[in-house]
A protein has these predicted regions:
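Radical SAM enzyme [4Fe-4S]-AdoMet core and its adjacent flexible, acidic
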Residues: 141-149, 156, 160-265, 270-274, ...
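Radical SAM/AdoMet-radical enzyme domain recognition
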Residues: 51-67, 76-200, 413
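Radical SAM enzyme core and accessory elements
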Residues: 274-276, 285, 318-398, 409-433
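Canonical Radical SAM [4Fe-4S] cluster-binding loop centered on the CxxxCxxC motif
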Residues: 5-45, 415-419
Length: 433
């Protein structure tokens, strides 16, 4: 019996691992070694097979997402993406809606690119790690030179042409202690309304991670720092992927949002420029090669293969006993298997490197998540969380400890912006009516 058409996500890499930058923490640059002499450009037959098989497999979906990542996909040139639109027009079923997405470092984006992306309604993800000093710490070009100015120039072009975009920000050793500053920069300086905050975890050996990696506690505190700012001022206006996913889990949806925190995984695969399909973007390795979409089995058949189903189910089945009895398991689900290289207090292998941070964050947001959940269940807007925070803040003295548990005083931490707004209101009273 053929597999039933259904929704899954394909991260396609038309240039493979090839990129014009040399970001120090990038795990994918080394994958170039898997395909020596391949040319690192997706050929026409793979391009057409990918789009045709994806559209056919997701015939019942409200919208089909066609995702291009890298490496750096803009190295393919605009004509590749023009060809993408031509193929989609020919291969799509009547009425089938398609959303094209592009994840880019933005350094090659100019007005021609931006006009094309705007005209064809691409959703663009821009990789940026915060203000200049934080961004340039690891995100450098092949010559080791900083990239911040080039990223901002590309982003400015996207904004001039009205391209819908979101920010993908890694949380690493250089910015991990500055959550609110990073968030405020993305929100206020760049105008980002959609954000992904991705932790950098580079496993070295044993239970060690690289010096560039964020620690578990750092990541948890980073998320809390951002959440406390977001919850007071931006619910409903700014969307942070981790917070949306968390709320979905508090609503009882254990497969919603990020695959990292879903109960099982396996529905997000990686397609190389050659047509090789891998179990996951983080498992582009010969041991996890499912097959090639131009050599017999289709994309859907490979995604639905027993091997891939077992890969996804293992996320739940390999959870240590420590995780199974954890009070925040419903929201965490053990994190991504790639980072489960610690040993539990019981001596069992398979604890996630960021476990301490996940517990910090999920326990901290339990009450506000319940508030939003209850608001939504009563048919109200989650923005009511702002009022809940405001009521609590009104009872807080300026010298009280901040609610983010940073150890700083309220007036010097998340209360600083509120105090500033209050001072402006006093200095500028409303006119007489």
């Amino acid at each position: 019996m053929p597999p039933v058409a259904r929704v899954f996500h394909v991260m396609s890499k038309p240039t493979g691992a090839i990129c014009n930058l040399d970001c120090e923490y990038c795990f994918f640059l080394s994958k170039e070694e898997l395909y020596p002499g391949s040319g690192f450009r997706m050929p026409p037959d793979v391009h057409e097979a990918y789009l045709g098989q994806l559209l056919a497999a997701q015939g019942g979906a409200d919208e089909v997402v066609v995702a291009f990542q890298g490496g750096e996909p803009t190295l393919m040139g605009i004509d590749f993406f023009r060809r993408t639109l031509e193929l989609e027009a020919r291969l799509a079923a009547p009425g089938q809606r398609i959303l094209n997405t592009l994840q880019t470092n933005a350094t090659l984006i100019d007005d021609e690119w931006a006009a094309f992306l705007a005209e064809n309604a691409f959703l663009v993800g821009v990789s940026i790690d915060g203000p200049r000093e934080m961004h340039d710490h690891y995100r450098v070009d092949k010559g080791g030179k900083p990239t911040f100015d080039r990223v901002i120039a590309g982003l400015d072009a996207l904004k001039r042409h009205g391209v819908e975009w979101n920010a993908l920000t890694t949380v690493n050793a250089a910015n991990a202690d500055h959550g609110r500053a990073v968030y405020s920069f993305l929100r206020d300086d760049l105008g980002a309304a959609y954000m992904q905050l991705i932790p950098i975890v580079e496993h070295e050996e044993g239970e060690r991670a690289s010096a560039r990696s964020v620690s578990g506690v750092q990541y948890g505190r980073f998320l809390i720092d951002v959440f406390e700012e977001w919850a007071r001022h931006d619910v409903g206006d700014v969307f942070v992927q981790m917070f949306d996913t968390s709320l979905a889990h508090w609503m009882g949806m254990d497969q919603a949002g990020m695959c990292v925190h879903a109960r099982t995984c396996g529905d997000a695969v990686a397609l190389e420029h050659t047509g090789d399909l891998y179990s996951c973007d983080h498992y582009v390795d010969p041991d996890y090669l499912l097959g090639n979409i131009t050599q017999g089995r289709t994309l859907l058949q490979l995604v639905d293969s027993p091997r891939q189903r077992a890969f996804g189910q293992a996320k739940a089945d390999t959870l240590p006993a420590y995780c199974r009895r954890c009070d925040v398991r419903f929201a965490c689900n053990g994190g991504c298997p790639k980072d489960r290289f610690l040993t539990t207090e019981d001596g069992e292998h398979g604890l996630h490197y960021l476990c301490d941070g996940y517990q910090l964050f999920f326990r901290h947001v339990d009450e506000p998540m319940r508030v939003m959940r209850d608001l939504l269940r009563r048919g109200r807007d989650a923005t009511g969380l702002r009022d809940w925070y405001a009521a609590g803040d009104a009872k807080r003295a300026r010298s009280d400890a901040c609610s983010c548990a940073s150890g700083r005083k309220w007036k010097e931490c998340h209360g600083a912006r509120i105090a500033s707004i209050q001072r402006m209101d006093i200095a500028s009273p409303p006119p007489d009516l």
